[in-house]
Amino acid sequence: MFLYLTDDQRKAEEVLGELLSPIMGRPVELVRERVLVGPANECVEKLAKLQAAGVRKVFLWPVADDAVQLAKFHEEVLPQLPQ
C-alpha cells in the first residue's frame, strides 16, 4: 500500500490528487480508500479493518521520505494496531 503519513490535510490531498491518482489511473475518491495517506489514526482504522478481514501482511511503499515515513509508521501506527 502506498504510504504517506501527515497531519497536514492540504499535503495529503496534494499527494492523493497530484501523485497517486494519476499513477493509479483512478479518481481521488477511490484512491483515498485504498492507500494510507493522512493522519496516523486514519491509517490505523484502515489497517484494523483489513486485519479484521483476515489480512496478515501488507507491503508498504512510502511515496516520499522513505526512512522518515517508515519510522513514523513504526512509532505512530503500529503501536495502535490490535495485536
Give short role names for the model-derived ranges.
Residues 1-7:
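Glycine-rich beta-alpha junction loops
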